[in-house]
């Protein structure tokens, strides 16, 4: 009774799908029937899924990621499915007697087969016959359970929740709420672009992912342990010995379990090193969610005594520019990334630590060494260098991005083959495949927009109004700075608090300071979704300056003429700059804003909007290179590196940039 089918009934155990039938697969459209069901499993929170009803399909099909692994069993007989190119694929797993609730009523499904189709759950004709008569209206359908009609509303906006980490997050001991799924778009997709979703190609991705995933970061079968590192002392004769800590009975028990796990995995060994640093257990938010404290070694003394690694980590905004115009993403997380880097014998001795069980040293790079992020970044960039047009890596986080799903299949396959070649181990439960919306480096990237994930805002609001000391204040300002792109006039907002961090300022926290922090948190009710400009969009910056602050906005004008906000930026003038003439401050504001947005503005032609009437004149005039005009000459030369047009913006119209420099307390 629907316009599309997954499997057409043929001979027993043999089904066929043609390309036109693929047209509406995994799409929400008026001719498709989606209903909401609820699944409950022992040890898991109950959760909702959107089920696709297809009377032309002979079987009920479910994703492996919404039914616990232990409930899947080998099918007594392989089911062969013929797909569009006449090739056969096998369905080998079945879940028996599955109970699903629809409209509050429990329905039992004798057999549900496992297959990744891009849909969480497909209800086939066998279910419709079992609970017949099946009736449908414009906005609802009906099945019959024990001669009673059960009315079920259709879902007009369907979502898919299945991903490798979904069930892990739904365990009862997990504090993670059910994460909203990915919208099943109503756009009509070219059949060829959906082709891989149920062909052997998608299965190849799943199989390849299984090959490179493990719970052991130095898996003896999968890891090639090609990543090596060496840590050197500044003074080769120096011995680092930090006094051991005392531990509670509970901590001793926690250490015993973790030390045994690390020994069993081959990550640490007993040590006779003359160096030693103390280990301790921490319980932050992530640890509380897992219900398990995490062992950390205090390597402060070692870090001060060893030579650093100067390999730079990628700039966040430069990474974002690579995602411009991309519509489909996959992300991967290296399993305990630093532990995949093997240390030489002398370096292992430097990592020696003390705990209740004795003296141990790491065979791999431990968390806490200052060199660790740079070492791992270098190795990952070396491995993935050939995939840099569609893949980027930030330490142990990998994201793959594409314009179409067919391209994306090829890109993901290429990245996973590189990972397999080098023996890099990934985390299966943190893998996200073929998503329109994805979280990466604390940002939510969704259909051409980006904003910080909810936990960033939650972290800001978790800070008490009264901050205890300078370190506490630094942490609060650090979280604000992380989200500076999304907070207008941040420079002005944080200035009254920043002065308290000066070395010559004695710590003194007053009630007015607490009120100010409270006001900041109140004004940050949510983060805006900012636009990620496409390569063909025309870019515009709007700038403004006040006596003490500068501000700017990056906007993009699409082909339809609509202008969207991409980024905010603001800052404060240095003490010497505060003495500049107002015209010079306006010029400096433009310079600062272009610098902040340079990753987007090079090498394209863009527009500068400013309410400074003298800016165009400044760019044209032939300045003398004497001491009075030396700074302006340097600025002229600096501006000449960029290609832009200037639009004069009346002050009353310069609302966006002006709001970044206006008094926060006004």
Swiss-Prot record:
| Transmembrane region(s) | none
For biological process, the GO terms are: proteolysis
Q: Which InterPro entries match?
A: DNA/RNA_pol_sf (IPR043502), Pept_A3A (IPR000588), Peptidase_aspartic_dom_sf (IPR021109), Rev_trsase/Diguanyl_cyclase (IPR043128), RT_dom (IPR000477), RT_RNaseH (IPR041373), Viral_Replic_Matur_Polypro (IPR051320)
- Disulfide linkages recorded for this protein, renumbered to the chain, are none
Q: Which reaction does it catalyse?
A: DNA(n) + a 2'-deoxyribonucleoside 5'-triphosphate = DNA(n+1) + diphosphate
Keyword Nucleotidyltransferase annotated: yes
Swiss-Prot/TrEMBL keywords: Aspartyl protease, Endonuclease, Hydrolase, Nuclease, Nucleotidyltransferase, Protease, RNA-directed DNA polymerase, Transferase
Reverse transcriptase domain span? 215-445
| Catalytic site positions | 54
GO MF annotations in UniProt: aspartic-type endopeptidase activity; endonuclease activity; RNA-directed DNA polymerase activity
Main role? Encodes for at least two polypeptides: protease (PR) and reverse transcriptase (RT). The protease processes the polyprotein in cis. Reverse transcriptase is multifunctional enzyme that converts the viral RNA genome into dsDNA in viral cytoplasmic capsids. This enzyme displays a DNA polymerase activity that can copy either DNA or RNA templates, and a ribonuclease H (RNase H) activity that cleaves the RNA strand of RNA-DNA heteroduplexes in a partially processive 3'- to 5'-endonucleasic mode.
Q: What is known of its domains?
A: The polymerase/reverse transcriptase (RT) and ribonuclease H (RH) domains are structured in five subdomains: finger, palm, thumb, connection and RNase H. Within the palm subdomain, the 'primer grip' region is thought to be involved in the positioning of the primer terminus for accommodating the incoming nucleotide. The RH domain stabilizes the association of RT with primer-template.
Q: What family does this belong to?
A: Belongs to the caulimoviridae enzymatic polyprotein family.
Q: In its UniProt entry, what is this protein called?
A: Enzymatic polyprotein
In its UniProt entry, the species of origin is given as: Figwort mosaic virus (strain DxS) (FMV)
């Amino acid at each position: 009774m629907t316009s599309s089918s997954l499997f057409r009934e043929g001979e027993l155990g043999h089904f066929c799908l043609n390309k036109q039938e693929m047209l509406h697969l995994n799409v929400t459209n008026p001719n498709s029937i989606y209903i909401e069901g609820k699944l409950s499993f022992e040890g898991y929170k109950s959760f909702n899924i959107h089920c696709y009803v297809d009377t032309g399909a002979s079987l009920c099909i479910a994703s492996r990621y919404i039914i616990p692994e232990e409930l899947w069993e080998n099918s007594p007989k392989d089911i062969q499915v013929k797909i569009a190119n006449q090739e056969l694929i096998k369905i080998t797993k079945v879940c028996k007697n599955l109970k699903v609730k629809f409209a509050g009523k429990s329905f039992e499904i004798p057999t549900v087969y496992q297959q990744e189709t891009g849909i969480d759950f497909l209800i086939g004709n066998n279910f419709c016959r079992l609970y017949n008569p099946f009736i449908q209206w414009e906005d609802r359908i009906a099945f019959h359970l024990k001669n009673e009609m059960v009315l079920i509303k259709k879902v007009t906006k369907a979502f898919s929740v299945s991903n490798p980490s979904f069930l892990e997050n739904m365990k009862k001991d997990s504090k993670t709420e059910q994460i909203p799924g990915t919208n099943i778009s109503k756009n009509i997709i070219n059949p060829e672009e959906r082709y891989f979703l149920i062909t052997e190609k998608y299965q190849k991705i799943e199989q390849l992912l299984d090959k490179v995933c493990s719970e052991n970061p130095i898996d003896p079968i999968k890891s090639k342990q090609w990543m090596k590192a060496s840590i050197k002392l500044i003074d080769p004769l120096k011995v680092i010995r930090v006094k051991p800590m005392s531990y509670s009975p509970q901590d001793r028990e926690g250490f015993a379990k973790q030390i045994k796990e690390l020994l069993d995995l081959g990550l640490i060994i007993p040590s006779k090193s003359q160096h030693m640093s103390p280990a301790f257990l921490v319980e932050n938010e992530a640890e509380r969610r897992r219900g398990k404290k995490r062992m950390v070694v205090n390597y402060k003394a070692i870090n001060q005594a060893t030579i650093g690694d100067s390999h730079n980590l990628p700039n966040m905004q430069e990474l974002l520019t690579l995602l411009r115009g991309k519509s489909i993403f996959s992300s991967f997380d290296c399993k305990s990334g630093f532990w995949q880097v093997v240390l030489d014998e002398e370096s292992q001795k430097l990592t020696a630590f003390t705990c209740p069980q004795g003296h141990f040293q790491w065979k791999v790079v431990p968390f806490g060494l200052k060199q660790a992020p740079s070492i791992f970044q270098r190795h990952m960039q070396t491995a993935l260098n050939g995939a840099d047009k569609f893949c980027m890596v930030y330490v142990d986080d990998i994201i793959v991005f594409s314009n179409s799903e067919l391209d994306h299949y090829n890109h993901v396959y290429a990245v996973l083959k590189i990972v397999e070649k080098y023996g890099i181990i990934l985390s299966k439960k943190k893998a996200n495949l073929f998503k329109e919306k994805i979280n990466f480096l604390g940002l939510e990237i969704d259909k051409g927009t980006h904003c910080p994930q909810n936990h960033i805002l939650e972290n800001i609001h978790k800070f008490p109004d009264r901050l205890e000391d300078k370190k506490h204040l630094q942490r609060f300002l650090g979280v604000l700075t992380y989200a500076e792109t999304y907070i207008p006039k941040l420079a002005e907002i944080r200035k009254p608090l920043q002065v308290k961090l000066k070395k010559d300022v004695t710590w003194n926290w007053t009630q007015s300071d607490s009120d100010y922090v409270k006001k900041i948190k109140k004004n940050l009710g949510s983060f805006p979704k900012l636009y990620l400009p496409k390569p063909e969009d025309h870019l515009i910056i709007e700038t403004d300056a006040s006596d003490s602050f500068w501000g700017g906005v990056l906007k993009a004008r699409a082909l339809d003429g609509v202008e969207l906000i991409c980024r905010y930026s603001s800052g404060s003038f240095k003490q010497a700059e505060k003495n500049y003439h107002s015209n010079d401050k306006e010029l400096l504001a433009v310079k600062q804003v272009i610098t902040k947005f340079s990753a987007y503005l090079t090498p394209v032609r863009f527009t500068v909007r400013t309410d400074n009437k003298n800016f165009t004149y400044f760019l044209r005039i032939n300045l003398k290179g004497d001491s009075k005009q030396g700074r302006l000459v340097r600025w002229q030369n600096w501006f000449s590196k960029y290609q832009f047009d200037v639009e004069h913006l009346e002050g009353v119209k310069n609302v966006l940039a002006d709001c970044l420099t206006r008094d926060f307390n006004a």
